[in-house]
């Protein structure tokens, strides 16, 4: 589907200083939603840079691209709120262009241009590669361009990618999903599952490692169904084991699996592959078997708890995280109590908790017994209070433990106020740590081994008593970070873990306390 829609605002001529001939246009990509969207945004940035655009330094860019989410209602509100704010900016900057892509664009299509006629281009999840051409066409024709494909045009992995992190990277192993969860609109927007061949995936991982990356996260809507297209039920566990053979790749993670298809061979591969991290994100959604049936989740709470038992038997210190929806249509107090019971038994390190949001086009939107907002809010608060307590108790078990932390790039006021650096442990816990006086500071991508001295619900703190309690391991990734700073004319302080922050997970932020 390709439409050209007249847009009076798009018809302005490029006269801003930044659009002067010979001067490169600037861009900004704003991402809403999941990890898949974060990775897609890296591709959008890569496409724009290949077309000659450069990242914007300030707030105003020649091109602003929104990569949207359609999972919850507030995603719509967030997009249109941002578009409204940009209207006056665009009027004050002739030649500026705005593009909207992602899941909401795939779903709403013409609605976006009707609600925000100052948008220049709308594209979907299946034709990310069309972005530069749509912008050029909109500029040339002085009309908004809308192009939505109903199936995948080119597998996204073939597109250029601008990675926001030199030490860690996302690698898609599949796109789309064959499940039919009643609350989820993603399969209708991203299509049926399509799997990449193992050789292509491993080649991309090797290229990342060659560029300095030490950590990779394998991405898919349902990673453990990987291989369905070429008939290999153990393809994902084989892929994990193959990652263990890549020299220089120190950490491998994946997200997200589905409990219904999570098999013992994957657990064995996690336990037996040296660089597979002791961390698992396993979406629960509900602890009520009745609600799980209404959600069409294809497993029950006993199976879910059985998976956790098997994982912890093979990987005793594994940190397990989850997703939970509160207030699904028809959820009773008894159903909700079943969720609380499963959460108590599961001992999650953290949980992404969501209030059910009615999404037109999903089967759940037509279910009877949609719950009042006040009931959903009250249950949500009880669930988060329980999970916060459990997270604090689980983190308290880390006190006195030595952990290896992959240092991340620092940004924001808090990093300057506390004089601590931050990173992720092998089990993905957030660790804030200080560098002893006289010790060498790490770079993003380096590793430090420290002892946990404080614990809170959402982070750990390590304040070494002296240099003997702090071990720095400089890495290829740290070297790559130094090169990236030199290439971008950055001038970091010697040894300081500062600079541009890495890619956000694109997931709801957990509240944090000051370290």
UniProtKB/Swiss-Prot annotation:
The residues that hold [4Fe-4S] cluster 2 are 177, 181, 184
Q: What is its main location?
A: cytoplasm
Please state every residue range assigned to the domain named Radical SAM core. 163-393
Protein name in UniProt? tRNA-2-methylthio-N(6)-dimethylallyladenosine synthase
DNA repair is among the record's keywords: no
Q: What does this protein do?
A: Catalyzes the methylthiolation of N6-(dimethylallyl)adenosine (i(6)A), leading to the formation of 2-methylthio-N6-(dimethylallyl)adenosine (ms(2)i(6)A) at position 37 in tRNAs that read codons beginning with uridine.
Q: One GO MF term, please? A: metal ion binding
Point to the regions of Low complexity compositional bias: 490-506
Look up the signal peptide feature and give its range.
none
Asked if the record carries the keyword Transferase, the reply is yes
Q: Which GO terms describe its cellular component?
A: cytosol
Alphabetized InterPro entries for the sequence:
Elp3/MiaA/NifB-like_rSAM, Methylthiotransferase, Methylthiotransferase_CS, Methylthiotransferase_N, Methylthiotransferase_N_sf, MiaB_methiolase, rSAM, rSAM_horseshoe
Location of the protein in the cell: Cytoplasm
